[in-house]
Amino acid sequence: DCCGVKLEMCHPCLCDNSCKKSGK
């Protein structure tokens, strides 16, 4: 799990804009 989304969706796993847009 990465920032609320699966690792596959958030490769960087930095909880940044990309992660927040895909997850929470």
Swiss-Prot record:
The tissues in which it is expressed are: Expressed by the venom duct.
- Record-level Gene Ontology MF annotations: ion channel regulator activity; toxin activity
Write down which residues bear the modification named Lysine amide: 24
Write out the coiled-coil annotation as residue ranges.
none
Family the entry assigns: Belongs to the conotoxin A superfamily.
- Domain notes per entry: The cysteine framework is IV (CC-C-C-C-C).
Q: Identify this protein by name.
A: Conotoxin PIVF
Species source reads Conus purpurascens (Purple cone)
Lineage of the source organism?
Answer: Eukaryota, Metazoa, Spiralia, Lophotrochozoa, Mollusca
